[in-house]
Amino acid sequence: MKIDVQLDGRPQKAAARARELAELGVDGLFTFEGPHDVFLPLVSAAGAVDVDLMTNVAIALPRSPMHLAHTAYDLQTLSRGRFRLGLGSQIRPHIEKRYGAEWSRPAARMREIVLAVKAIFDAWEGNSRLRFEGEFTTHTLMPPTFDPGPNPYGPPPICLGALGPVMTRTAAEVADGLLVMPFNSVRHYRERTLPAIEEGLDRAGRHAADLAIYPQVIVGTGRTPDELAAASRGVRSLLAFYGSTPAYRPVLDVEGWGDLQPELNALSKVGEYAAMAELIDDKMLTTLAVHGTPEECAAEIVERFGAYSDRVCCYFPGYPIRDGHIADLVAAVRELTP
């Protein structure tokens, strides 16, 4: 099993941190669309390390498929074939109020964006003329001046982030990979995610081998009591943030904790973030995340996801983690999955 970890998104830190993480033995690095651009750190990392790189995720709805295609194609070249384009839809308030973009039928739009980017790639690879005419976007013009030509490493795979059944089915129908959202549980994955994957593959006439599955897991790790307590606080805060979002309530519902979501949401609206974290008890912590020593976390990751995937994305949220603990976790996963 391969382990990907998050790259520091600050442009001035990305290359140096990429080298440090690569030396720890990680297999890949990913960025998320937070306080910094999601693509720029990977430009720096591509020239600094030889590990795999991925956006996890680039918010697709405010962007043109042509913009996404150009950036992904160039990152594929810079990374010498080690880039994956991870796309996500975000939720309505962010799309409308932060990005100032239109929100409607997110799964249908994401499906069309993935297909449009693939059509653009096919045109550049010389496989077909560009003629994509969809409901939301149209791309039918590609003069030679704007055509980069075939990529020496081939077009990058496109992964789609999903949690609910509709978006998960969409990913299984059209994407090369599924990024399983980190706010998840084993029960939700088995009862909700896997059936949606199978349904999407069946609809599209695809096979399991056509879709790479990348589970994402929230990790709280340390060795001393103080380190584990700090990790617990960081993880609880992130779980409370996710849990306050109505779109993520289905995960809580599966575990019988659905009534917690409106309580968390109400606290978030008045800025009571510390109180939100206090509502995440130990059972929730160990169900929705993994917590313990690096070796204990590695064993739990393999137990949860080893039967479904050979690659997992790990988050270490809101607490100072020692580089040695990352290296130990990666080494332990490799020992358990030779």
State the predicted function of each range.
Residues M1-P338:
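Active-site-adjacent structural elements that line small-molecule/cofactor binding pockets in enzymes
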